[in-house]
Amino acid sequence: MDIAHDLQSIGAQEQALVFPHFDPARAWALGNRMHALATARGHAIAIDIVTFGQPLFYAALAGATPDNADWVRRKRNVVAHFRRSSYAIGLRMQQAGASLADKHGLPLSDYSPHGGSFPLTVAGAGVIGSITASGLPQRADHEFVVEALCAELGQDYAALALARS
């Protein structure tokens, strides 16, 4: 895995995966799409979609644990703070040889810079929330969210997927 290349690719994902508008009905549709995809693949994950301050969709699939819910919360907090994907922030910290606690004073008990939370961006409004998955390895959590967003927005996932490691 090339961190610089992944960071560039994640930036392209964040630029491309923008909703023209977003409301609770769209959150429900996206959440159900993610639930169906995870169920078909046998993923034991938690799925969370929020606008900042308002939960819109949550599901814990068979095999997910309360620990996944806490990972969701901590990854979601990273997106809320930085307005970037949690994986991008984690890779930046890895590249810098630093932690969120060291560099930004953010406690790891509340912020997790691991893959799986992605900014919910609306054209003309910016980042308004996050879409999060937890239960797979961090890169797979990130890509699961990106794949679902591509399907929801009619984008070609193959063109936006991270390089295979």
UniProtKB/Swiss-Prot annotation:
InterPro entries named among the record's database cross-references: PduO/GlcC-like, PduO/GlcC-like_sf, YBR137W-like
Gene3D superfamilies from the UniProt entry: Haem-degrading domain
Pfam family membership, one: HbpS-like
TM region positions: none
Family, per entry: Belongs to the UPF0303 family.
NCBIfam families: PRK02487.1-4 (NF002695), PRK02487.1-5 (NF002696)
Entry protein name: UPF0303 protein BamMC406_1480
